[in-house]
Amino acid sequence: KLKMLKNFLYNKKAPNISLGGSFILTDQNGKIFDSSKVNLKKLIYFGYTYCPDVCPFDLLKISKIFENNPNLKKEIKPIFITVDPERDTIKKLKIFMENFDQSFIALTGTSEDIKKVLKKFKIYVKINKSNPIDKDYLIDHSSLIFLLDKNDSYIKFFRPNELKRNIALN
């Protein structure tokens, strides 16, 4: 355990952590996206388009990093995965992503597809509906950003406020 902690603290790949992996979802243009076919590292953020504050703010921070460091786009693919496939349709994602760097890809899928990906990353999600047919609701979810290697293996996670200083180190 001490070795694992030291590896994490010194920004090395932590051994024996089962997070991440390949996934297939649908992008904001309606095309199938297979993460295993992307020969870049992946920076993954989970959120939803109806989020009133945190998600758009975090995505804007990620977007600015890529806008200000164009060479990162040759190494890392920024990815937004919805935790709200019921409301985050392909059309909604396409409009939403117009606010961010063009290198970003937004992904959705069926509820089952999204649940599988959430499980791979151990993402906590709680939908706060006042009744089952409520369409205006908030979602509590993990707010972490994951970095995967070219083979979709976990490298590290960041909290949004740690991203800028750590992204260059990986």
Regions found by a protein language model. Give the residues of each.
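Short active-site neighborhood of thiol/selenol oxidoreductases, capturing the structured segment around
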Residues: 33-62, 79
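Short, internal strand/loop/helix patches
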Residues: 94-142
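Short hydrophobic signal-anchor/transmembrane segments that target glycosyltransferases
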Residues: 61-72
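Hydrophobic beta-strand positions
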Residues: 24-25, 147
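Thiol-/selenol-based redox modules, centered on thioredoxin-like
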Residues: 130-170
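Thiol-based oxidoreductase modules, predominantly thioredoxin-like and allied folds used
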Residues: 74-88, 103-112
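Short loop/turn microsegments at loop-to-beta-strand junctions
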Residues: 20-21, 41-42, 142-144
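N-terminal targeting signals for export/organelle localization
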Residues: 1-24
